Swiss-Prot record:
The gene is HOXC6. It comes from the Eukaryota. Belongs to the Antp homeobox family. One of its GO terms (molecular function) is DNA-binding transcription factor activity, RNA polymerase II-specific. SUPFAM superfamilies: Homeodomain-like (SSF46689). This is Homeobox protein Hox-C6. SMART domains: HOX (SM00389). Gene3D superfamilies: Homeodomain-like. GO terms for biological process: anterior/posterior pattern specification. CDD domains: homeodomain. GO terms for cellular component: nucleus. Sequence-specific transcription factor which is part of a developmental regulatory system that provides cells with specific positional identities on the anterior-posterior axis. A motif (Antp-type hexapeptide) lies at residues 40-45.
Length: 153
């Protein structure tokens, strides 16, 4: 199962590897003199790259792009539970071919999006006084959910 996940997902340097594959294919078909005439301008070079020993090829990972299926499954899970237990996070990660860390961060981001959306709707419908009351209520709700999560584990 895990090997299928590895084969189906693309690495974090996908764009770089595609560009390298493309340039290697071009190199096979193009004559050597044409290859030497290609100029590399400063804007084509990687920014903040370190050539020293001990640095990885790319220190910062690119943005994770989730498939429609992965997004749908994550949204369904979020609809039922805004907080995951570690066991459930592992199950979802294996099912969707993602890491636990990716699942955790997706849920953190989704909770922030949900919070912003709920604050926006409450301020539009309730007026100015409702925002302070909502923020207090949100803290109590968060505490209750945290206690429920502890009981699940």
């Amino acid at each position: 199962m895990l090997s299928n996940c590895r084969q189906n997902t693309l690495g974090h340097n996908t764009q770089t590897s595609i560009a390298q594959d493309f340039s290697s294919e071009q190199g096979r078909t193009a004559p050597q003199d044409q290859k030497a005439s290609i100029q590399i301008y400063p804007w084509m070079q990687r920014m903040n790259s370190h050539s020293g020993v001990g640095y990885g090829a790319d220190r910062r990972r690119g943005r994770q792009i989730y498939s429609r299926y992965q997004t749908l499954e994550l949204e369904k899970e979020f609809h039922f539970n805004r907080y995951l237990t570690r066991r459930r996070r592992i199950e979802i990660a294996n099912a969707l071919c993602l890491t636990e860390r990716q699942i955790k961060i997706w849920f953190q981001n989704r909770r922030m999006k949900w919070k912003k959306e709920s604050n926006l709707t409450s301020t539009l419908s309730g007026g100015g006084g409702g925002a302070a009351a909502d923020s207090l209520g949100g803290k109590e709700e968060k505490r209750e959910e945290t206690e429920e999560e502890k009981q699940k584990e």
